[in-house]
């Protein structure tokens, strides 16, 4: 941020309690909240945008993956679920997850939107309804396919393998301008090419007159009668969360965009608000991800090239999406089998390796988000449905086929109970023929949804398709929690499109 952004407050700026009165208060500066803030300031509304985390500048980014996670992620990046254990990371910084994600932008496929409309009574959430909002967000962020000159070998080998097998694939569209292919998305883009919210929508909202309060934890939604009228929280010390000055914002409308885990906790902590349907915190869904390492005879140097630059959407109706992957070596090493000398030998192969992953759509695998007695970090429970487990095996088997078609000499599947290395297609058949249990896969997911789902029937959902809470006037939700089911693809662009629609509705007096 520049010095001209005088309405951006950081921790050092607070020396007393904060009192604000505004048209709209938006809780959460991630992709959805930032869109709402910018669109409403464009419409002439007074907006206060609140973020619990601090802002980061490129000089503050840390290439050390675990250290970066400890600073930018909730619970130090070590959040997991009960039940079927799955690690999941949510950001705590200005810009939210957009600061540390791979900038992947994919529109939800038609079959997903059609299912949402028919199964959840959402008649105006079809392709024709959402495309204008996708288009508006895409134009603002410069969303476009990854150009070949920044793909690097890791991404091009994926294309080579898919082409050899006749599997359709494509460059991933991303919200970047002038990407250099430095592969540092996970720890923050030092070149500022990635159009994360802190360099795109938030500055635009500031230029439009928004006030942005960072290092403020919202703890309660204030309600008068049947109407939400503001929020209460505290200034918190970055990285420790120690509270100090009280913050009160009175507003004509409250928009919760804190993410599908923090938003339901905030509602629960506010007296179980907006829960006439019983759906607040219910229906937690993930995109469980599995990754495979392939080792090639030639140098790959996987640290070079767009972090995630190529994908195949061919298997979406089979329940999974395939894509390339990169992250700091210390993060990826967690997925490698072995210990001691064996692990060191495998890690020494990194210059010849590529990592690709599959994300699974698991609509039968459900969980919940519940507030703990103290603090705002949630109690997460999630269970893998047995009928969803074969999707992971199918994804890994397909990745093995692509790796060998691209020329890999060995793949490392990261699955318990089978060989640590597979050296041929014949050996990889075990991924197709064996019956697996969920706990045998090394999975993770940062895509989470559905905990405040939208539904046309107030008895079965928290909000309507415009993000309006059924139970309270003046309260809106704009994050991936309103998805009725998982979107089958990376969720950011769909969340932003829905948030754009919600903002336009509010601006029109809704």
Place the predicted regions along the sequence by residue.
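Extreme N-terminal leader/targeting segments of oxidoreductases
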Residues: 1-24, 42, 500, 508-510
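N-terminal Rossmann-like FAD-binding beta1-loop-alpha1 element of flavoenzymes
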Residues: 24-49
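Residue-level detector of alpha-helix initiation sites
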Residues: 30-31, 261, 482
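Glycine-rich loop(s) and the adjacent beta-strand/alpha-helix scaffold that form part
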Residues: 39-42, 46, 53-58, 62-63, ...
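Redox-cofactor-proximal catalytic regions of oxidoreductases
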Residues: 67-146, 357-361, 365-366
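Glycine-rich phosphate/pyrophosphate-binding beta-alpha loops
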Residues: 102-106, 480-493
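Conserved redox-cofactor binding core of oxidoreductases
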Residues: 123-220, 228, 410-442
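FAD cofactor-binding and catalytic pocket of flavoenzymes
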Residues: 277-403, 410, 436-450, 470, ...
